[in-house]
Regions:
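Amphipathic alpha-helical surface "interface" segments used
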Residues: 72, 194-206, 316-317, 323-330, ...
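Bacterial Sec-dependent N-terminal signal peptides
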Residues: 2-3, 8, 17-46, 53, ...
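Membrane-proximal, proline-rich intrinsically disordered regions
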Residues: 24-73, 99-102, 106, 110, ...
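Beta-strand acidic-aromatic groove motif in beta-rich domains, primarily in extracellular
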Residues: 59-68, 144-146, 230, 449-452
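C-terminal functional modules
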Residues: 395-514
Length: 514
């Protein structure tokens, strides 16, 4: 597949080559033309690649967010874990930005350019626009102001130093794009990406639900800065129809063989970078589950503990819940003598490289709807029933991810739900905290979406790790840093963004977090 995308990887070289050889002999050109080569990649192939690359960014620096949200830690100071807020972890935050623009942002832009003016491809155009919103939303939520309106225009319009759009403008446009795309999708048009659509295999109805679910997510993101707009978009999303059935979950499927792009990006990165290994003791970077996460699961008698976690006993993985133990993030540089006794992600669930990656779930829809109900924006169901449905869905989805290895007994689910009912007689703040404590566990391992909701709501109420020499004064990051290279290659646009948004600092809040 690499050859198919060479034109888009080296556009300037290709353009220069065309001008150099215009005077060449026709026969020479014919001799040097490979009749079996693909001169222009098919739109379907580019769409598949954009899906793969966009989903892969869930793994890119995902382990850093694991540490930041206190799921995991390491006794070493390594950039793979964000649990200590150290210089090496700070310097790693530009990676998502650097990796996104040459891949999924450029790729989905090429798809849109190819189909937007063809009235027979209205569904392809809508699907591509929805995926573009997904990719950009993940990017802007980490950095704030980013290149958006001029992004990916180097080959087409020779814009090599794109401006940074304000996050407020990006959000306004993304929400409008979702509305327009969802409206445009139609079952009367059969032109889709078919099996090249690795999420829904061309199912128009499911793409529509995905669009409205993203609208629900992004609309709720506005609650701190513009509650009126948040309510308006959330109401539209609910009316349009969001993901409520397991068959509609947005997910990418993977395999255990083939190239790395075919493997679950979260599991693959954790294993490939040696941050977490399934052998208990020979762990190069010293990663384990953090005590905050394991202690919470144990204290709440959460049946997911045995699904997510193992301790290696004499070289054999044990899911015995009584022996699970998290490692403190305060351990400094020296491998603890009892390292092997700390819990780590289970190989057959969390570290399963052929497990699907869930992009939007039934659990997330229900938790967001529960908050909407608390705010008085949705009255068809109670916050309590939506909250409970969210918990059940979050537990049952491990069966979808891992098969029978992830199955949780119905009796244990029922018992947990009964013990953690929403405190409807308490304040809205107390109930909101309950909802987002469940999001912390229920959306795992999507650490970025948990991080987004943590910044917006303040829940779960995590206690920062005041590690010696940390770079944030013992505070949890509020955003990622732009790549240092942007200060050289795109200085004017970078400076404008910093002046508007605030210092390029880990503690500067993005627009919707202010």
């Amino acid at each position: 597949m690499k050859k198919l995308f060479s034109k888009y990887t080296f556009p300037i070289l290709a353009a220069c080559s065309m001008s150099l050889f215009t005077a060449c002999d026709k026969d020479f050109a014919e001799i040097n033309t490979n009749p079996n080569a693909v001169s222009v990649p098919t739109t379907a192939y580019i769409f598949s690649k954009a899906l793969y690359d966009g989903a892969a960014n869930s793994g890119n620096k995902g382990s850093l967010l694991f540490g930041l949200m206190q799921y995991t830690t390491s006794y070493n100071d390594v950039e793979g874990f964000g649990s200590k807020y150290t210089a090496s972890q700070v310097n790693a935050t530009g990676g998502v930005f650097t990796n996104s623009y040459p891949t999924q942002i450029n790729e989905i832009g090429e798809v849109i350019k190819a189909v937007k003016d063809d009235p027979t491809k209205v569904n392809q155009y809508a699907m591509a626009r929805i995926w573009r919103v997904y990719c950009f939303s993940r990017l802007t939520d980490l950095y704030g102001d980013i290149p958006y309106s001029e992004a990916g225009q180097g080959y087409n319009l020779s814009i090599f130093q794109p401006k940074y759009d304000a996050q407020s403008a990006i959000y306004a446009d993304m929400l409008k794009e979702l509305e327009a795309s969802a409206t445009a999708l139609t079952t009367s048009n059969t032109s889709t990406f078919g099996n090249s659509d690795l999420i829904y295999q061309g199912n128009v109805t499911k793409w529509k639900k995905f669009a409205y679910s993203l609208m629900l997510r992004l609309g709720m993101r506005l609650t701190k800065v513009d509650a009126a707009s948040a309510q308006s978009w959330v109401t539209k999303a609910i009316a349009g129809g969001v993901i409520r059935d397991y068959a509609d979950i947005a997910k990418m499927s993977y395999t255990s063989g083939g190239q790395n792009i075919n493997k679950n990006p979260i599991a693959w990165q954790l294993l490939n970078d040696n941050y977490l290994r399934a052998d208990g003791i020979n762990n190069t970077e010293g990663g384990k589950y953090q005590d905050v996460f394991i202690n919470s699961l144990k204290a709440n008698n959460d049946p997911r503990l045995g699904v997510l976690s193992v301790v290696y006993v004499n070289g054999t993985a044990s899911s015995d819940e009584s022996i699970q133990k998290g490692m403190p993030a305060t351990i400094n540089g020296t491998k603890p003598a009892d390292f092997v006794t700390f819990s780590e992600p289970k190989q057959t669930t969390v570290l399963k490289v052929d497990a699907p990656l869930l992009l939007f779930t039934v659990a997330e829809s229900n938790f967001l709807l529960a908050e909407a109900a608390l705010r008085g924006w949705y009255s068809a169901e109670t916050a309590s029933s939506l909250y409970e449905t969210g918990i059940r869905a979050a537990m049952q989805q491990w069966d979808l991810i891992s098969g029978t290895t992830g199955t949780i007994a119905q009796a244990r689910i029922d018992s947990y739900v009964a013990a953690h009912a929403l405190k409807t007689s308490s304040s809205v703040a107390v109930q909101t905290e309950q909802i987002y404590n469940q999001v912390w566990v229920g959306l795992f391992p999507d650490a970025q979406e948990v991080y987004n909701n943590y910044r917006r709501t303040g829940y779960p109420a995590l206690t920062p790790n005041v590690y010696p020499g940390n770079a944030t004064g013992g505070k949890i990051f509020r955003r990622f840093l732009y790549p240092v290279l942007e200060q050289t290659l795109n200085r004017a646009s970078y400076n404008e963004a910093v002046q508007r948004q605030g210092t390029d600092d880990l503690l500067t809040k993005v627009w919707w977090d202010k």
